[in-house]
Amino acid sequence: QTHRLVAHQFDQGQEMHAELLKVWENRKDEVGYLGNALYSMVTTLKAHIADLKATTAAKERIEGEMSAARAIQMGMLPHNFGEPAPGARFDLHAVLEPAKAVGGDLFDFFPLDEHRLFFLIGDVSDKGVAAALFMAVTKTLFAVEAKRDSASVGGIMERVNHSLCENNPEGMFVTVFAGILDLRTGEISFSDGGHELPFLLRHDGGAAMIEKKKGGLVLGFVAESVYRNDLIQLQPGEGLVIYTDGVTEAMNGDHELFNATRLGDSLAAISPDCSARTVIDRVMNSVRAFVGEHPQSDDITLLALRWHGPSGNGPPAAD
């Protein structure tokens, strides 16, 4: 009888339980004690398996929901860059390489009129679906406010910030760098809300972080925050590289950060004739080579922009 019990499979359920219970009731010797022990073990194991199945199903459901949230988030970002047309006055490319968790990085760009290009990059303070939703709201507000009144980048920031603060029960915030490039003059009017300062790509080669300005607070924190306008004057062939802290805080196996110095060195090694796409690709390659197999903990977002002059010298013939 004991051999028959051992031969049973755990998923035979009630039949096995009944036999174990019968052994336990009819025998008071070692076999009875064994039956009692087996009965307790099987009962515990079945409960554990049931819990495990429920946990696995819940985990798979959550992972599916997070994957869907990430897909929706990525779908909101510009993704069809194409190649700059000959004679184009500017060249722009951007990338967002997501970490496993749903994050809140964002970028956007769009023409305000025939001669002005709006662009921004941002980083929401948190992770998860809430951060993705906050990112979507932020991106939408910037598009609405910039197209409604683009006289001042600082004014756009103030209106977006006020809207974010009005309904923000989770206390989330977002760092933002936003600007308007005048394609006729190469002048960039920009405003900074607690974001990393970009690098200037010089027309004769090299790169340098732009001069430190008195930036504003992160958006979503204080409704009455004031955001100033600052100016950068580009020469033909010059541009900007804007990034989130996922770039400079990328970590290798020795727990060293990629940092702004390494980013500057990587940019300085890139030919001034390279396209915006190539600038992005080479920086990403530098980050990946530095990080190695260490897992990515944050979204990595980069935006590169070059101005080719008022008449447009077009993109480089080759990179």
What are these model-derived regions, one by one?
Residues 16-34, 88, 131, 153, ...:
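The cytosolic transmitter module of two-component sensor histidine kinases
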Residues 256-271:
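Divalent-cation-assisted or electrostatically stabilized phosphate/pyrophosphate-binding catalytic cores
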Residues 200-203, 251-257:
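Cytochrome P450 core scaffold surrounding the K-helix E-X-X-R motif
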Residues 1-20, 42:
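Membrane-proximal alpha-helical signal-transduction linkers
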